[in-house]
A protein has these predicted regions:
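Aromatic "clamp/platform" in nucleotide-sugar-dependent glycosyltransferases that forms part
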Residues: 237, 256
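N-terminal strand-loop element at the rim of the active site
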Residues: 1-43, 126-129, 214, 392-406
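Active-site anion-handling motifs in enzyme catalytic cores
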Residues: 350-716
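Short hydrophobic beta-strand element within catalytic cores of glycosyltransferases
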Residues: 17-18, 273-276, 286, 627-629, ...
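Conserved acidic donor-binding segment of nucleotide-sugar-dependent glycosyltransferases
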Residues: 288-289, 293-300, 309-314, 665-671
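Short His-centered aromatic/hydrophobic patch
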Residues: 63-69, 87
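A short helix/loop element that forms part of the nucleotide-sugar donor recognition site in Leloir-type
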Residues: 153-169, 527-541
Length: 716
């Protein structure tokens, strides 16, 4: 924190208030940070802090820690400036094992956090934790602790440092180190157990424990019970952490909960590989097998395997140490943290002072359809490319699900008064993506979406129909109403396919800016192949087999066509070795159609479990050899991964998109086994060709006009 404050003072005036004189305040003064200490109890500190803010020309009050949070919460009503707090740890776990403290200090801290205008969360995982507990996503900013890479390495040998602390480990020891306070949430006992198992397989292993706390006696007793007392050294509180990290070979973290601990970045600065529990923001830096090793909390046997793998392979230790150093220097330096904090301050002040900012998105979200959720992921991600802290509010059928799944603020569709308030505060209203302007599934939904467009314009928003599809519009009244509303209210339209453009002209849309771009999902990158394979393997699906992905849906006449599809799948397995893998996009509706297709089929098949993770699903489809789909977004996922595809069109939107993507498409009523086989063979013959790659790249480039249009409408 002091390094961050020192860096901030190179750009802004930042004063530090402490409530007790201690080493922290002394160090701050030595670093040149303007520091005041208000001792004398809570009320004295509260009064002096209020006087300081009243007499100072401050733009923001930034609180760190439970006492500061409570002070800020009580003072907030007296000042017209934003109050923010940095959430370093889970307030529900801060007093784990201390029920009285949790009932008093813990509850007061919780209430104080709710009173803040904004919260800075140390890691995306901590931000997600607060979202799950009801905090407004648009008021939460993620940040990651940085480390100062400019500090020189300590001029001390391991032997000298061991002598200073009274440790007599042999010179050739492989030292595992853990630096943590001894309380339940840090779970140092798992490290002790994990080390004990590893020590049985490598006699050179030693464990150095730096820290103090209520669990010390328990930990010492555990070492004795495991018969490793002669291989463990308790160093107590360590002031020279540079010397500590220069003296260990493997850094250990076994916490049950973390944000983004300094222990992981300090070890990275020293070039030491880390073995850590998969909690909080740790996986942002520690990528399993690439920059360190991860295990699940409490799993001391997995920790044993990780420690042994590193202890028995010096080359691997050096490789992971170099990799984590490079990644930390690139992404987690003090300078990058300082820039991030300054950006948060700028955003907070702008929001506090400007009457309008951000975007409201309205679409078919919260219905449980993976395709629509992928659209929201894509649109939000593109908006974040303009400003990573952009205020985004989503109109959703299931606002709670949208908040938790996407990390975005959301309101229910029937909350009209709340929608009006949000529109008055926003610059841009996005209608889309997807096929919202159609009256096949429901006329009422069409009228709802047209009403929201009209409402947005009435309340001063610029309006964009974003990467959307148009039609079908079967009723004359709906066609007239759609054209009238769009012409009156919409500033720009970006369409996902040429058929939609034809319909806009047909119904009389005269908006000047109408572009054919593409579906926003096309530019989702997807997660890594390693993530996809790990997910498949964890659900009993061998990722190295060859698969044909099936994105089907129930539709009138499906039962009659299931035999044709079954015969084609049997052929693809017999002749091509392709195992059918069913991937339901709307799990509640699509999963049941697997049974009539597979009934009597001798080919093996697999069914993808529900994920609610569009980026993971794209990565999984990328592993496929072929995609056969009725669901539009199954075809789009395949296009993202440049996988050969066959469309089975039950709706003009599928035909239009398939034509735009250059994908072969069969009208659903015309599906026969032989036609499906012939079309699949033709698609497979294109696999890996330059033409396929060029076609998809062209369309992805065109799709980028969706966000460029939004950027211009936002005035960015």
């Amino acid at each position: 924190m002091l390094s961050l404050l020192h860096g901030l003072n190179e750009h802004i005036d930042a004063d530090l208030v402490c409530y007790m004189e201690a080493e922290f305040s002394e160090s701050a003064r030595e670093m040149g940070i303007p520091t005041q200490v208000f001792e004398g109890g809570f009320n004295v500190g509260l009064k002096k802090t209020r006087e300081l803010i009243e007499n100072g020309d401050y733009d923001i009050v930034h609180c760190h820690g439970s006492r500061a949070n409570l002070t800020g919460a009580l003072l907030k009503k007296h000042f017209d400036i934003p109050f923010i707090s940095t959430v370093h740890s889970d307030y529900k776990l801060d007093y784990l094992g201390r029920p009285m403290a949790a009932m008093t200090y813990g509850q007061l801290n919780k209430l104080a956090l709710h009173r803040m205008d904004y919260r800075v969360c140390v890691s995306d995982q901590m931000r997600q934790t607060l979202i799950d507990r009801g905090f407004e996503p648009s008021e939460l900013f993620p940040i990651y602790n940085g480390v100062d890479f400019s500090r020189p390495k300590p001029d001390i040998t391991r032997r000298e440092w061991f002598c200073d602390i009274g440790c007599d480990f042999p010179e050739d020891s492989i030292v595992v180190g853990i630096a943590a306070r001894f309380d339940a949430v840090k779970d140092v006992a798992t490290t002790v157990r994990g080390f004990a198992g590893a020590a049985e397989g490598n006699d050179r292993l030693r464990l150095l424990i730096a820290g103090e706390g209520r669990e010390r006696e328990m930990l010492e007793a555990l070492c004795a019970e495991l018969d490793i007392r002669d291989k463990v050294f308790f160093a107590g509180w360590v002031n020279d952490m540079d010397g500590y990290y220069a003296s260990v070979d493997i850094n250990a973290i076994s916490s049950l909960s973390e944000t983004f601990p300094y222990a992981v970045t300090e070890a990275a600065r020293a070039g030491i590989p880390t073995v850590a529990s998969r909690v909080g923001g740790i996986p942002r830096l520690i990528i399993n097998g690439e920059t360190g090793m991860l295990f699940e909390p409490h799993d001391h046997e997995a920790m044993t395997r990780c420690i042994l793998a590193l202890a028995n392979d010096e080359v691997l230790r050096k490789k992971l140490g170099r990799a984590v150093y490079d990644k930390a220097r690139r992404e987690f330096s003090t300078e990058s943290t300082c820039r991030r904090q300054l950006k948060i301050y700028k955003t907070v002040i702008e929001r506090y002072n400007e009457p309008r900012c951000g975007v409201v998105i309205c679409g078919a979200y919260g219905h449980g359809n993976a395709g629509d959720e992928a659209l929201l992921t894509a649109i939000a991600g593109q908006l974040r490319s303009i400003d990573e802290d952009m205020r985004i509010v989503v109109v959703s059928k299931n606002a709670r699900h949208t908040r938790r799944t996407h990390g975005l603020s959301a309101i229910r569709r029937w909350q009209v008064l709340r929608l009006r308030r949000e529109l008055k505060r926003s610059k841009l209203f996005i209608s889309g993506g997807g096929s919202l302007i159609q009256d096949v599934t429901s006329r009422r939904s069409l009228w709802f979406y047209l009403h929201t467009i009209s409402l947005a314009k009435k309340h001063g928003c610029r309006v964009q129909m974003y990467g959307c599809g148009m039609g079908p519009l079967n009723y004359d009244y709906d066609r007239r109403r759609a054209a009238e509303t769009i012409n009156r209210c919409v500033d720009a339209i970006t369409l996902r396919d040429p058929l939609s453009l034809e319909l806009t002209r047909e119904i009389g849309v005269t908006v000047q800016e109408v572009l054919v771009t593409g579906d926003p999902v096309l530019n989702l990158r997807g997660r890594s192949d390693a993530d996809a394979k790990a997910f498949l393997r964890s659900h009993g699906i061998e990722p190295n087999e060859k698969y044909v992905c099936l994105g089907l849906r129930n539709w009138p006449g499906f039962a009659e066509k299931s035999g044709e599809i079954r015969a084609a799948l049997q052929y693809l397995y017999d002749k091509r070795g392709l195992i059918p893998l069913f991937m339901p996009m709307n799990y509640d509706r699509d999963a049941a159609i697997t049974e009539p297709i597979t009934r009597g089929m001798s080919a093996p098949f697999r069914v993808m479990p529900k994920t609610e993770d569009a980026e993971l699903e794209i990565a999984i489809v990328r592993q496929m050899k072929l995609c056969v789909a009725m669901r539009l977004h199954s075809l789009l996922y395949a296009a993202c991964g440049e996988v050969p595809s066959v469309g089975l069109s039950y709706d003009p939107k599928v035909t239009g998109c398939a034509r735009y993507l250059g994908i072969s498409c069969i009208e659903f009523d015309d599906v026969t086994a032989q036609r499906l086989i012939d079309t699949a063979e033709a698609a497979l013959s294109e696999s890996g060709t330059d033409e396929l790659e060029r076609r998809f790249e062209y369309i992805k480039n065109a799709e980028r006009m969706n966000i460029e249009t939004a950027r211009r409408l936002l005035g960015e």
